[in-house]
Amino acid sequence: ALVPRGKAEAFAAAVADAFTRLYPTVSGNAEYTSIITERHAVRLRELLADAQAKGATLMRCGTDAGSGRQMPLTVVTRVNEGMHLMQEEIFGPILPVLEYDSLDDAMALVRRGERPLSLYGLGLSDADQARVLKETHAGGVTFNDWGWHVFQHDLPFGGIGNSGMGTYHGEEGFRELSHAKGVFKRHRWFPVGLFYPPYGNLVQRLAMKFFIGNAPTGPRPPH
């Protein structure tokens, strides 16, 4: 998450409060997800340990520490790009928070990393939203909320660069997963002889017109 300079701690506290209201407890909560395997849970705990060892502040949300593969959300402030959680996809309930000084600064942070699968903008004016769309790259974008572009059946969904290739959902998904077969059938009147040597001035002019768009006049240049 990118927040204005000086707002990281207040943002982390607000996120923790909202999480606690939604999930008062994590352990044994059937409405709260689990990490898919113990190996991935260990990887997430190692990311948090690395960040804390390098100076980050961890704010664990909820009223309990979770158990097994049920891990509560952890908001991480005072992060830097040397931490492992800033160098790879997290795939877990960890939210790093970076501070920015201006919209230009925030967009520079986005451009400096790999192109994300999704980008979310909250509280931006229409003009700033237009700037974000023009000056950053992302697989998809939601303004004033999160994730909703994924659920629109008539919007293409997919990544760009490291976050994936291709688009899916609706017509875009049908086209992506279908093969459009190109077929050419030559008819008898097709002037195929023009494509065989020897070439005259007419063929030269036609070729220049087709490939360059400006057919020269005059005799052919000597070889």
Task: Label each residue range with its predicted role.
Residues 70-223:
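Conserved C-terminal structural/oligomerization subdomain of aldehyde/semialdehyde dehydrogenase
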Residues 1-2, 145:
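Short internal beta-strands
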Residues 3-115, 121, 127:
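NAD(P)-dependent aldehyde/semialdehyde dehydrogenase
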